[in-house]
Amino acid sequence: MKIIITGEPGVGKTTLVKKIVERLGKRAIGFWTEEVRDPETKKRTGFRIITTEGKKKIFSSKFFTSKKLVGSYGVNVQYFEELAIPILERAYREAKKDRRKVIIIDEIGKMELFSKKFRDLVRQIMHDPNVNVVATIPIRDVHPLVKEIRRLPGAVLIELTPENRDVILEDILSLLER
């Protein structure tokens, strides 16, 4: 089962993913990304990756000098890959052996897609009919892979909105039990 969650920025995709991870417990393996905010000004300064193992690393920041930019955020692809690739490889191995495992990928977005290793691994995972995945994608097709995932045969595409975000969790958990 492939469950693809999309929606406008700030609608609650990552919050929903974290609730799914909490409910699935050890069945969930993967990562999510979240904003990094200045503790004093509360302004967003970057993004960090957090794995289901509890590892964290800032991979995108207004303070990074990089040729890879998304708006004013420099993206350090190596920092992202250091956490994302090992956890996704482990998740994929375990999910192939145990159908109850769920691979978590939040998000398949512009910053993450700078990594060719990530693109290749995500494509392999998403096209494997024998593994369960919960992934998030931007509302807009920011990359050909996002477009490909949005049109994946058999995948369930859910657009998260302010109207459904508080009631969709149980539906997603039910889909994963099939």
From Swiss-Prot:
List of residues binding ATP: 7-14, 102-109
A Pfam family per the record: NTPase_1
Keyword Nucleotide-binding: yes
One GO MF term attached to the UniProt entry: ATP hydrolysis activity
Temperature dependence: Optimum temperature is 70-80 degrees Celsius.
Keywords, comma-separated and alphabetical: ATP-binding, Hydrolase, Nucleotide-binding
Secretion signal span: none
Top-level lineage group: Bacteria
Family according to the record: Belongs to the THEP1 NTPase family.
Subunit structure: Monomer.
Protein name stated in the entry: Nucleoside-triphosphatase THEP1
Species in which this protein is naturally found: Aquifex aeolicus (strain VF5)
